[in-house]
Amino acid sequence: MSWDQVWIDVNLATMDPSISAPYGAITNAAIAVKDGKIAWLGPRSELPAFDVLSIPVYRGKGGWITPGLIDAHTHLIFAGNRANEFELRLQGASYEEIARSGGGIISTVKACREADEAELFELGRQRLNALAKEGVTTVEIKSGYGLDTETELKILRVARELGKHHHVDVKTTFLGAHAIPPEYKDNSDGYVDLIINKMLPAVIAENLADAVDVFCENIAFNLEQTERVLSAAKAAGLEIKLHAEQLTNMGGSALAARLGAKSVDHIEYLDEAGVKALSESGTCAVLLPGAFYFLRETQKPPVDLLRQYGVPMVLASDFNPGSSPICSTLLMLNMGCTLFRLTPEEALTGLTLNAAKALGIEDNVGSLVVGKQADFCLWDIVTPAQLAYSYGVNPCKDVVKNGKLVHQ
């Protein structure tokens, strides 16, 4: 066989649903790569003969290979920090109170408007490197800290540039509808007009976004405004998603499902009717335990109902300066289990196959299947559950991206 590389002495957590074993596991396995794709995988005993003198062979020392991790919800590009708000919350101020007093997202908006692209790129690069060291091979990055045309475009340009200069694939999401900017404080509908009539066309003209998102909440955009933005995005051929039911149950998830959204994110206050709507539309539920933990929330997402209705559950970092300044997907695995009572297998599925579904890229990544992109990680672990069980010592030993060894 003519391959570019072969990995032996490994166990595979393929996350392939067609394999009945937990994690889609194949023990005592091997995997071969050709032209950036997975060319063969299976039990080591069934590996076809190949020229060991001309093809690089990597020995996994009994470790586990998983698909590359996918962080499907981040706000990775921002300037400044909000440590002062952290102190205020510890003194009793709520997220909503801080936002209504001009803090929260708006304080980060000011810092981002003042920062240039070079500064934002370097900050984003450092954060992306941190995720990459934990086995992340694909990441979604949202805008939303500009809230004017110039700065929203600036953030999205930086995200695109990061994708060009880093081995991690970057998917971009336009989140101009993240908050009401100060200049539109008494005219939120006017700001929605700006998003639809000026921002969105400018984003499309430069091909800066793969999807459009809205923060549907009582401190941000109402249902009617949300539908206007998402409908405009959908009409333009972009994927849509939604921050929904984080602080209250406004019915945003049902709206997103009706419009065919790829995902609804946060969903702590999602009810059974909303879960049923997601199930019927195939929309993913993105769980964000970092924000739940950092904001010290008590209302948990309805995991049992999501299981009951077969809604794909995704885990993501929601890395951002205000509600989840936690740049770690491995910690999300642990939090997903300890805070939301996911099983370790559900948690890992949420950072691989289901995360790919939330981004619409499941045909190419998210599981180890012949023909898919060769994005995978070798972990120094004895069982896949160990990734969720233990935190603090990074067990990621090697990362292969598009068939190339990028971290060793």
Curated annotation (Swiss-Prot):
Protein's pathway: Amino-acid degradation; L-histidine degradation into L-glutamate; N-formimidoyl-L-glutamate from L-histidine: step 3/3
Localization in the cell: Cytoplasm
Enzyme Commission designation: 3.5.2.7
Molecular function GO terms recorded: imidazolonepropionase activity; iron ion binding; zinc ion binding
Top-tier EC class: hydrolase
Catalytic activity: 4-imidazolone-5-propanoate + H2O = N-formimidoyl-L-glutamate
Any one GO cellular component localisation term in the record: cytoplasm
Keywords: Cytoplasm, Histidine metabolism, Hydrolase, Iron, Metal-binding, Zinc
Binding site for N-formimidoyl-L-glutamate: Y145, N320, G322
Cofactor note: Binds 1 zinc or iron ion per subunit.
Residues reported in the UniProt entry to bind 4-imidazolone-5-propanoate: R82, Y145, H178, Q246, S323
Cofactor(s) the protein needs: Zn(2+); Fe(3+)
Residues that hold Fe(3+) according to the record: H73, H75, H243, D318
GO biological process: L-histidine catabolic process to glutamate and formamide; L-histidine catabolic process to glutamate and formate
Binding site residues for Zn(2+): H73, H75, H243, D318
SUPFAM superfamilies on file: Composite domain of metallo-dependent hydrolases, Metallo-dependent hydrolases
Chief place of localization: cytoplasm
The keyword Amino-acid biosynthesis is annotated on this UniProt entry: no
Function, as annotated: Catalyzes the hydrolytic cleavage of the carbon-nitrogen bond in imidazolone-5-propanoate to yield N-formimidoyl-L-glutamate. It is the third step in the universal histidine degradation pathway.
Family of the protein in this entry: Belongs to the metallo-dependent hydrolases superfamily. HutI family.
PANTHER family, per the entry: IMIDAZOLONEPROPIONASE, IMIDAZOLONEPROPIONASE-RELATED
Protein name: Imidazolonepropionase
Gene (name only): hutI
